[in-house]
Amino acid sequence: MLKLFSAFRKNKIWDFNGGIHPPEMKTQSNGTPLRQVPLAQRFVIPLKQHIGAEGELCVSVGDKVLRGQPLTRGRGKMLPVHAPTSGTVTAIAPHSTAHPSALAELSVIIDADGEDCWIPRDGWADYRTRSREELIERIHQFGVAGLGGAGFPTGVKLQGGGDKIETLIINAAECEPYITADDRLMQDCAAQVVEGIRILAHILQPREILIGIEDNKPQAISMLRAVLADSNDISLRVIPTKYPSGGAKQLTYILTGKQVPHGGRSSDIGVLMQNVGTAYAVKRAVIDGEPITERVVTLTGEAIARPGNVWARLGTPVRHLLNDAGFCPSADQMVIMGGPLMGFTLPWLDVPVVKITNCLLAPSANELGEPQEEQSCIRCSACADACPADLLPQQLYWFSKGQQHDKATTHNIADCIECGACAWVCPSNIPLVQYFRQEKAEIAAIRQEEKRAAEAKARFEARQARLEREKAARLERHKSAAVQPAAKDKDAIAAALARVKEKQAQATQPIVIKAGERPDNSAIIAAREARKAQARAKQAELQQTNDAATVADPRKTAVEAAIARAKARKLEQQQANAEPEQQVDPRKAAVEAAIARAKARKLEQQQANAEPEEQVDPRKAAVEAAIARAKARKLEQQQANAEPEQQVDPRKAAVEAAIARAKARKREQQPANAEPEEQVDPRKAAVEAAIARAKARKLEQQQANAVPEEQVDPRKAAVAAAIARAQAKKAAQQKVVNED
């Protein structure tokens, strides 16, 4: 009973929710054996044909390459690509690739030489003697990737599994309509496929190995059973035909009954899955020593005259393959890379075949029907019933259309396998898969931007922390430098402290002076004299330095004298040519004269009432008289040059002249009656008289040269003459006094 139950358990399969049964259309291409395609003239090899970053170029334009020669270096998750044939690298430039967006990617363009020469191949027939790491590294460097459609690097996938893998699943379901590449590969190369499975099992050491294949491939099932007849370590499980039973999560559940958690991987539950084509590529890489340079591609559709499966070199233009199969395009011909549900339409036929290309479908106009116009969602829930991932496609559609990224993420849009079952059953002809692809791309872009922002923030915070640490260290250094003086400063401080202590000690000592003795201050006096001598020497040195710095250059002195003379001449010319900007107002002059008379009367009263304690100094009186004469001459000139706006009163002028004569006589009498204590210097008096005569002559010349604009007032002339007579009389008296 237990054996029967174990056998039942061993062969048990599970069924997943949802799924559809579209027309298979596989008989068009699975009836003919694999065949080779003639080499194309030009090959375009994109550097990135897998999930992850592109490798580093190791060839340049003009290089000769052989088939299997690496074009890039694979480091980390970067997978290298290899030359599909021998030839010459003619260009390394962007080129449109096999992608729904048809964006250009960096590619190596090779012109084939037709010889198709291989690099030296080193196969490991005894791979069981190799370590796990060596096998994984060889698989990675030979460019093996998942050929089922994902394109994930096989070496990285094997390395990530580690020792946790208990079940190795080989996906041979190939559930999508039209595609028969794996079916034909298993029919023609079953032994090589099984050998590749054994290499994977040797690396992973799983507890069980399962091959899942749909029951619509009877020839492939027969070939595998024949190869596995003597093997007990590999189990072949035939499953019902249902789309998409070939999905990784769906096939895992069908064969093991285990579900991959949301956001997780199959390795989390101890399962690792590889494709049939990947197993065959592993065999060729390890045992034959051949990098992946070709793969099986299905050429099908009613627009192709000879449908079938071919060995297509990577980098071969799609146009070359279709033309070799008898392509008969219509007016609006469509070519799909992949199947009708998960594939995408090519914008043109010059894109190259890559590692994930498994089918080229060229349907006729009647084969797929006319494209239907998209209509509004009626919420019929047919898409939810057909979804194999147990999602709500109608809700995801609304979230994607409304740019509600958070809600779309909450409803597990990342679990969508883009199988197209929802779009197939939609009565409104809504291309749901396109909406979901766009939404996932936008979410990925947002997360990438958030990641960049987080990295930038981390870098900024690290920089700020570094600056704060440097600032704290700098302040600490400054603080330490301020607290701890330098060596020479320490010596100076110690010397100063020693002097202070010595003085304090001397101050505390009692001074004892014996009777009859004087204190000996010779040392102090000598020190004082030394300081004085030092100060004098320093002063003399400073004086010499200043004298040396201020020695006049003869040329410089001459230049300065010339400049002084020029300035003097310029000043004389300005004074001679200057025209009075403002005329003297007679009324203002009269007011000033009245003020002067009042001050003179006040001074006379003070002198009359005062008792002279001291005699008047004749020299001081002479100076005051000279100042008075100068002021009088200045006033006369201003009055002579002024244009009288109003007539002067004759009586007032006569009064002013009389007052002036009285003041002059009084001042002449004071020096005459004074007893001089000291004799006036005759030479000084002569000089003053000469200066007065020179000024008088100058005044006469100015008056003679002046152009009288108006007639001179006779009364004013009389006043001026009286003043001149008084001045002359005073000068004569002064001369007599000097002679006595």
From Swiss-Prot:
UniProt entry tagged with the keyword 4Fe-4S: yes
Comp. bias (Low complexity): 573-583, 637-647
Annotated binding of [4Fe-4S] cluster 2, by residue: 387, 416, 419, 422
Domain annotation 4Fe-4S ferredoxin-type: ranges: 369-397, 407-436
Subcellular compartments: Cell inner membrane
Domain of life: Bacteria
Cofactor (UniProt): [4Fe-4S] cluster
Broad class of where this protein is predominantly found: membrane
Pfam families: Complex1_51K, Fer4_7, RnfC_N, SLBB
Xref: SUPFAM superfamilies: alpha-helical ferredoxin, Nqo1 FMN-binding domain-like
InterPro entries: 4Fe4S_Fe-S-bd, 4Fe4S_Fe_S_CS, Ion_transpt_RnfC/RsxC, Nuo51_FMN-bd, Nuo51_FMN-bd_sf, RnfC_N, Soluble_ligand-bd
Region (Disordered): 571-590, 602-716
Keyword Cell inner membrane: yes
Membrane-protein topology: Peripheral membrane protein
Gene Ontology terms, MF aspect: 4 iron, 4 sulfur cluster binding; electron transfer activity; metal ion binding
Keywords (A to Z) from UniProt: 4Fe-4S, Cell inner membrane, Cell membrane, Electron transport, Iron, Iron-sulfur, Membrane, Metal-binding, Repeat, Translocase, Transport
Subunit field text: The complex is composed of six subunits: RsxA, RsxB, RsxC, RsxD, RsxE and RsxG.
Reported function: Part of a membrane-bound complex that couples electron transfer with translocation of ions across the membrane. Required to maintain the reduced state of SoxR. Probably transfers electron from NAD(P)H to SoxR.
NCBIfam families reported in the protein's UniProt record: PRK05035.1, rnfC
Stated name of the protein: Ion-translocating oxidoreductase complex subunit C
Organism (species): Escherichia coli (strain K12)
Lineage: Bacteria, Pseudomonadati, Pseudomonadota, Gammaproteobacteria, Enterobacterales
Gene: rsxC
